[in-house]
Each structure stands twice: as C-alpha cells, then as structure tokens.
C-alpha cells in the first residue's frame, strides 16, 4: 500500500464512520431496503457484476466525499441472494498515475477461480488549454485480479490512448470482456472526432495483451458517445446494450438527457452483422449505465444505476442527508415471444407476505416496501396512484408514469412525465421501495423506473375485472 492509498483509506473510513454516526443520531428518511445505495456520498454505474463460488459481487462507482459526485473509486457489496447485501468497503482506489483522476467503469471476467477486473483509468491533464474531449484526457484500460473478491493484486495498465484508432477522441471507456472459443474479446464505448458514437472490439489470447480488431457502428450516426457497452446472448438472441449520449430530434425530446437501450444483432458481431433499431431498456426517469452478467444457474442478471447524469430537471433530496442514488433492483432478462423482457429476480419471492388478493380495486396504506401485481386487465382499464402524487395509467395504447406536482420540493423532486406506446395492456407489476418505484408492463416488455420521496405510503389501484395482489416485502 502506497502513501496515497493509505491516506485515501483513512479518509474514506472517516467519511463512512461520520455518516453512520449521523444516521444513528438523526436517522435518514429515504434509505432503501431492496436497492443498493452508497454508505455515504455518491453512487453511479454498477461495475464488475458477477457471481463467484455462490457469492454475488456488485462493485459501484463511488464518490464518498461528496453527495453530488467527485473522484471515483470502486465500492463493493456482496450477497448470496441478490437482496441482502453486505458492504465490503472500497476495493479499488485512484492511487496510480494511470488512474489518478478516477477508477472509472468496467467489468468482471471469471476464469479458473480468478476474477479479472477490467476498468478505465481516468487521467485529466492540467496546466494546458484542453477541451478534455480531443485533448487533455487519458483513458487507460487497466486490469486487476483477485481470487476471493476481497484481496486484490497489483494493477496492470493494458491499453493507452495510443493503442486506440487515431480517429477517436479521448473518450474510450468501460471495458466488458467475454470469451468465445479460445479467444478473449473486449468491447469498449467510443466517440469519434466527428462526434459519432460507436463501440470497439479488441481481442487477446491471454487476457493481458490486447489488439484492436473492429468497430461496431449503426448504419447512420446515432449519438456522439456509446457508453457502458455490453454484449451477450440469451435464449438464442444476440443483444448489444449501450448507453447513448447525444440523441436529438422529436423521438427523444420527451426522454431523458441520455438513453440506455439495446440493439438486436443479426449475424456475427465479430464479423458481418446488422443492428436492429434501438430499444430502450427503461422508459422511466432514473435509469442509466446498465450492466449484466450470467449467474451460475444460467440466468442473465441485469442491474442499472437508478439515476441520470447531467440532469438539471430533477434532483434527490437525500443530498442533504449526505448520500445520493441507488441501483435498480436486480432483473432477469429473458425472451418471450421473440421480445426482450425483464422481471425482478425470483429470489424476491422468498421475501413476500401477501396482504391482499382482490378484484377490481385495491387500497393499501402504511407499507413502504411492496409488490403489486395486476393481471387479467380487461379493455385496457388501469390506474394506480402512489402516495397521492405518482400516477400510473393507460390510455389509447400509451402507458404513462407521471407526477401531479413537478416542484423539486414535492414527492417528484422535479420529475414530470414519461411514457411508452405499449399496445394492448395485459398486466402490470409494481415494485416499490422507500424512495423508488419500478414498474413492469406486459411481462416486463416495457419497464419504468423512478425515484420518489413521499412522506406517507399509500397505493390505490383501479382496474375493473382485473386480479390484484399486494405483497409486503419483509
């Protein structure tokens, strides 16, 4: 441990201890039960998601010194059931010349009992006239390994700016690694000097020495940056996920600042391929930078940052409590009738206690953490009102999530309206936590996620002839 690492360890420990003492004394109103949060400060992208020897690992972008962001390091949680998580502290600090301005996002690759963590080491040069897009930034690809997810070896710098194609800006980041046959592949997000987003493929025979292989591009320019790329196959469907910055036009005018979605891949992504139109993973307010991994039982598990970068429209009142943001609840990605769908991981079933099983209408108060299922919806009639201010409803093929008040001091904290054209409405699942709501429409073909900040907890559901259940989450 070098002197910088030692000092960072002490500073982080002090910040976390002070936050714990503060919350023990005064409490915190909106801490979640099901969703991972930072102990103190700021959380953003999920990193290094994996399951090794029965234990799930979730690393996260962590800025413990400021609830509105700052220098990034990797915090670390573990779990055996994807619900009850144990905080393991900071695993990776920005303590080397090649990552001194942030241990940025990356992924985990497992092989032969070893966890290989690949990430982007961020360096911002000083004392120069830099725009930090084309000049002044280093985006270094770094590797660190561990046998147990707790004790880590030395960092290795694998790729520098000079190893990337010359027509790119300094924005190359977020490595994700997989293996096919005897070759290892790495995908990274990139921005060209012409402000076109794309993904890069690198290949290696040993997980250490990497060489540029090819690009992944849409037929027409699509945004200026593809962040947090992820490639996987599930049920025979090939999926390229990316968080895209810079989408403009009428189609995106009512959406978030940046989008997170996926392309279906026809062909071989390493050779000849065609990308489908872009589909959003989530149509709500708070969703960005998703990553996935394959669990030991073969399920594809998907987790996202339940937040939105560079958003001035809305905020989170937990900032005054010394922390901000959380992850989405882990989701299973599956294919139904050729469509990509999502649902909460099945481990949640063991935590449910059914309180109501009714027809037509449901009212429940005083329970902040719950799941509501509405099945057998007839003639598309559906409305749910949460804490009097968050409304979910359907009309003429459009499903909406909207708040009655947009004020930053209200339940919405500034959020207004999000929607999707869903066609016929068949069923709705609502998963609510202390300060978040995730809504799964038509078996999870469409999903809406939002933070919300009620003083009292109540839900009223109206759907004539539908079957409605309310389960308290223990």
Segments (PLM) and residue ranges:
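Repeated scaffold domains used in trafficking and secretory/extracellular systems
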Residues: 226-229, 288-290
């Amino acid at each position: 441990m070098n002197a910088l690492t030692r000092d960072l360890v002490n500073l982080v420990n002090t910040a976390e201890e002070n936050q714990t003492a503060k919350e023990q004394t005064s409490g915190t109103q909106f801490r979640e039960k099901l969703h991972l949060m930072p102990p103190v400060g700021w959380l953003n992208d999920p990193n290094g998601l994996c399951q090794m020897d029965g234990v799930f690992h979730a690393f996260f972008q962590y800025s413990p010194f400021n609830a509105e962001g700052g220098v990034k390091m990797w915090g670390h949680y573990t779990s055996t059931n994807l619900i009850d998580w144990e905080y393991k502290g900071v695993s990776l600090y920005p303590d080397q010349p090649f990552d001194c301005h942030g241990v940025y996002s990356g992924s985990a690759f497992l092989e032969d009992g070893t966890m290989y963590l690949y990430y982007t080491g961020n360096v911002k040069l000083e004392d120069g006239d830099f725009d930090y897009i084309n000049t002044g930034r280093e985006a270094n690809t770094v590797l660190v390994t561990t046998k147990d997810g707790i004790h880590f070896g030395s960092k290795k710098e694998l790729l520098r700016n000079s190893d990337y194609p010359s027509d790119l800006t300094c924005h190359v980041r977020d490595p994700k690694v997989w293996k096919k046959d005897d070759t290892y592949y790495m995908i990274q997000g990139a921005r060209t000097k012409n402000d076109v987003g794309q993904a890069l493929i690198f290949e290696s025979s040993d997980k250490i020495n990497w060489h540029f292989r090819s690009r992944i591009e849409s037929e027409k320019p699509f945004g200026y940056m593809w962040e947090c790329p992820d490639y996987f196959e599930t049920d025979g469907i090939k999926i390229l996920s990316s968080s895209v910055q810079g989408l403009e036009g009428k189609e995106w005018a009512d959406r978030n600042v940046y989008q997170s979605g996926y392309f279906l891949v026809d062909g071989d992504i390493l050779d000849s391929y065609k990308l489908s139109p872009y589909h959003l993973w989530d149509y709500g307010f708070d969703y960005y930078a998703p990553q996935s991994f394959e669990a030991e039982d073969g399920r594809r598990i998907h987790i996202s940052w339940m937040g939105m970068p560079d958003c001035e429209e809305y905020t989170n009142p937990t900032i005054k409590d010394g922390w901000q943001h959380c992850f989405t609840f882990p989701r299973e990605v599956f294919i139904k009738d050729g469509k990509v769908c999502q649902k909460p991981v099945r481990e949640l079933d063991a935590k449910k206690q059914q309180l109501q099983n009714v027809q037509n209408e449901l009212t429940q108060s005083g329970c902040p953490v719950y799941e509501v299922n509405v099945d057998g919806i007839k003639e598309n009639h559906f409305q749910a009102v949460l804490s009097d201010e968050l409304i979910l409803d359907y009309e003429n093929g459009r499903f909406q999530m909207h708040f009655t008040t947009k004020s930053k001091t209200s339940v919405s904290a500034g959020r207004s309206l999000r929607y999707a054209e869903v066609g016929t409405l068949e069923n709705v699942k609502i998963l609510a936590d202390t300060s978040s709501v995730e809504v799964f429409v038509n078996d999870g073909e469409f999903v809406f996620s939002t933070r919300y900040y009620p003083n009292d907890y109540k839900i009223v559901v109206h759907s004539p002839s539908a079957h409605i259940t309310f389960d308290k989450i223990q």
